Amino acid sequence: MSSKLLFPEDFILMGFTKYPWLDLPLFFALLISYMFTLLGNMALILVSQLDSQLQSPLYFFLTDLSCLDLCFATTTNITYIGCMAQAYIFHWLGCTECVLLGVMALDRCVAVCRPLRYSVIMDHKHCRRLSGTAWLVGLANSLLQSTLTVQLPLCGNQELDHFFCELPGLIKMACVDTTINEATLAVVATFLIMGPLSMILLSYGCIAQAAFHTCSSHLLVVSLFYGPGIYIYMQPSGDSPQDLTKALTLFYCVITPMANPFIYTLRNKDVKGALRRLLRSAILSKRI
């Protein structure tokens, strides 16, 4: 039985079609959140690149995270040519963020526990290597999981009970035994979620007493991202209500990217100072 390629014209994205009264509120909520996502992440990227005082590894990784969140939110708000293209990109970005959050925790651990050697250990070359590893691991996992999903036959099934093309929803559309796909997804997701999460908890466990104020923002972002991911991916398929799964997915792919730059900015004096200097320079340049 041959597989059927999925393109937007081939099937219907259901979303919350059982609750039509949610259409208009959801439209405006998603539009506003997407605009804040663009504004917040672009501002953080801009000040990190233009301000000479924000050239440390911390802001290198924050810039990387903001770029990732911009792509993440855009992937789930703008329709791509085909459903599979969206699935590949969405899964790639999600896996990359899992690994990148772990790398950022390692950076904080080195900064607090080894401050005298921090600039040597976390030099620019090493930061780029860690960032590249996160992106490559996410890409490799996306190629594996999405390719396995593409090959599943649909047997005429055209209704995808989701907002966009995410792998668990696509697997449920198949008309054959998907045990291998579900097991592979669960095993790899466990590794990619619990591996970085364990590294984060271990890193912050070592420095919690000495510098909790430097970690609280990152821990908040971690809880917002990993909490829904653990619930959605690390349980047997079909055990959770689909509406709850959709709501949690919407939370971590829309709300989290919007919240990340504000969480980091509002609790970071350096970033707030850089924003003020950037605005002051812009105002003075217009006067001149």
Write out the residue ranges for each language-model feature.
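Transmembrane helical core of 7TM receptor-like proteins
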Residues: M1-I288
